[in-house]
From Swiss-Prot:
Name of the molecule in the record: Large ribosomal subunit protein bL12
Record-level Gene Ontology MF annotations: mRNA binding; structural constituent of ribosome
Role summary: Forms part of the ribosomal stalk which helps the ribosome interact with GTP-bound translation factors. Is thus essential for accurate translation.
A Pfam family this chain is assigned to: Ribosomal_L12
GO CC annotations, alphabetized: cytosolic large ribosomal subunit
SUPFAM superfamilies: ClpS-like, Ribosomal protein L7/12, oligomerisation (N-terminal) domain
UniProt key word Ribosomal protein: yes
GO annotation terms (biological process): translation
Keyword Translocase: no
Keywords for the protein's UniProt record, in alphabetical order: Ribonucleoprotein, Ribosomal protein
Family annotation (InterPro entries): Ribosomal_bL12, Ribosomal_bL12_C, Ribosomal_bL12_C/ClpS-like, Ribosomal_bL12_oligo, Ribosomal_bL12_oligo_N_sf
Length: 123
C-alpha cells in the first residue's frame, strides 16, 4: 500500500498546529536532521553599505619626507601640539595626525601636509 504526496498533504492539512509540530519533531529524531531555517549570509552587503556611509576619517602621516621642519610646522598648525610633540609625531610615522574628522577636514589636512612634503593617507 503506497501513499501519494497528495494524501500526505491532505493529512497535514487536517492536523492541528500542535500535531504538525509533534510530527516534525518525530521526523527530526527519525532521520537525524533539523528543520531549522538556514541563515542567509548578508554580511558582505552590510559591509559595503557601511563603507559607503563612512563619515569619520583618520589622517595618517606615513612619512615626513625631505622637509621635516615644514611637516612639523604643518602638524603644529593642524593639531595645536607643541614643538616637541609635533616633532615626535613626525618622527614616529606612520602615525595618525588627526582621528575621526570629516572628509572635508581630512582632505584639507592631507593637502596641507603634502604641500609641506609629507606622505599622507586617509583611512
Amino acid at each position: 500500500m503506497s501513499i501519494t504526496k497528495d494524501q500526505i498533504l491532505e493529512a497535514f492539512a487536517a492536523m492541528s498546529v500542535m500535531e504538525v509540530v509533534e510530527l516534525i519533531e518525530a521526523m527530526e529524531e527519525k532521520f537525524g536532521v533539523s528543520a531549522a531555517a538556514a541563515v542567509v549570509a548578508g554580511g558582505a552587503a552590510d559591509a559595503g553599505a557601511a563603507a559607503e556611509e563612512k563619515t569619520e576619517f583618520d589622517v595618517v602621516l606615513t612619512s615626513h619626507g625631505d622637509n621635516k621642519v615644514g611637516v612639523i610646522k604643518a602638524i603644529r598648525g593642524a593639531t595645536g601640539l607643541g614643538l616637541k610633540e609635533a616633532k615626535a609625531m613626525a618622527e614616529a610615522a606612520p602615525v595618525a595626525v588627526k582621528e575621526a574628522v570629516s572628509k572635508e577636514e581630512a582632505e584639507a589636512l592631507k593637502k596641507e601636509l603634502e604641500e609641506a612634503g609629507a606622505q599622507v593617507e586617509i583611512k
